[in-house]
């Protein structure tokens, strides 16, 4: 699996002498055997070889327990290095190697955790490798919590940030059902889902317009965990409902969030009102607009005009006058 980790490597010709690749691997191996792990980032950065093989591939010659010990020692040695982005290549190669090894977990999760805690972001291809390794493990009938808790056997502990990256990886390759299972199972490993956890999966569900499941997850995060959905997540859900012409459900979601004392932003109200107008649900649009004004928001003038005109077109004169007065009072 070819991974290009930085612009310098991307500019390299694909054809390189085998000797230069072997020399780099030998140099890395020498530092590993001498436990001079802190020198490895400089080795990888200074190398001008475009890596068509992983410089840590020699790890495969070590027994599993020795491999775990070496990687753990290396991860610990990288923590104090500054700038924190300096070990980026090292983390990337370690993550690539562990995820493609015959027994990726729990070591790969430990590497991923340290990568994220360092502030480094795994390369995009990691989503594919992590999802593939995870699904292979799950096919062996291992539960979500069981796989995550294996980290404890090597001195690490699963956390929400690591789980959230796993969720984003599964969603990136459209494994949405598995993402939901991880979302529901991560609590068993002591990783309580947060707004980001739910936001990632809800956003992915909305992308493919699986609104029923997205609605259930939204209600679950609010009621079961007492979480406040991000405005971006809410907008995605309401937009998906509008695209599916399920505007009544969008209105119900806003009412649900208001009842649960969760804030609803201007963009969300405006989006739902426009959806109501598209379906000629003028009374419903007026209802949402009234609720919107009660929270200090006022629709755009074009939207206000459409609501009044729509109500008039269906002979809802009394309601049209009341809504107009409400808009006028708020403007003043």
Describe each region flagged by the PLM.
Residues 1-121, 125, 139-142, 319-332:
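N-terminal targeting peptides
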Residues 35, 66, 102-103, 138-139, ...:
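Residue-level detector of the short coil/turn that links helix A to helix B
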Residues 43, 74, 111, 147, ...:
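Alpha-helical solenoid repeat scaffolds, predominantly canonical TPR units
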Residues 278-332:
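C-terminal interaction modules of eukaryotic adaptor/scaffold proteins
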Residues 20, 24, 40, 54-56, ...:
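Pentatricopeptide repeat
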Residues 51, 82-83, 119, 155, ...:
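Inter-helix linker motif
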């Amino acid at each position: 699996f070819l991974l290009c980790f930085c612009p310098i490597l991307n500019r390299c010709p694909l054809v390189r002498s085998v000797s230069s690749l072997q020399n780099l691997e030998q140099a890395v191996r020498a530092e590993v055997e001498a436990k001079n792990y802190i020198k490895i980032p400089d080795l990888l950065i200074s190398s001008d070889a475009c890596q068509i093989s992983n410089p840590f591939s020699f790890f495969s010659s070590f027994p599993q327990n020795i491999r775990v010990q070496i990687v753990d020692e290396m991860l610990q040695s990288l923590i104090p290095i500054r700038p924190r982005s300096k070990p980026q290549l090292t983390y990337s190669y370690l993550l690539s190697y562990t995820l493609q090894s015959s027994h990726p977990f729990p070591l790969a999760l430990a590497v991923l955790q340290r990568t994220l805690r360092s502030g480094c972001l795994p390369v995009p291809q990691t989503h594919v490798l992590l999802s593939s390794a995870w699904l292979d493990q799950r096919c062996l009938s291992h539960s979500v919590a069981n796989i995550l808790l294996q980290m404890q056997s090597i001195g690490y502990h699963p956390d929400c940030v690591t789980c959230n990256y796993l969720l984003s990886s599964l969603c990136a390759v459209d494994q949405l059902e598995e993402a939901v299972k991880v979302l529901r199972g991560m609590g068993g490993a002591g990783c309580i889902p947060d707004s980001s956890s739910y936001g990632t999966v809800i956003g992915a569900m909305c992308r493919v317009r699986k609104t029923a499941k997205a609605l259930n997850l939204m209600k679950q995060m609010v009621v079961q965990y007492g979480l406040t959905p991000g405005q971006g997540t809410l907008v995605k859900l309401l937009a998906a409902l509008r695209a599916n012409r399920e505007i009544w459900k969008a209105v119900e979601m806003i009412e649900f969030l208001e009842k649960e004392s969760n804030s609803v932003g201007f963009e969300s109200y405006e989006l739902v009102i426009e959806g109501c107008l598209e379906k000629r649900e003028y009374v419903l649009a007026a209802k949402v607009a009234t609720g919107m004004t009660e929270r200090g928001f006022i629709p755009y003038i074009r939207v206000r005009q459409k609501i009044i005109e729509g109500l008039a077109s269906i002979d809802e004169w009394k309601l049209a006058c009341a809504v107009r007065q409400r808009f006028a009072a708020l403007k003043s």
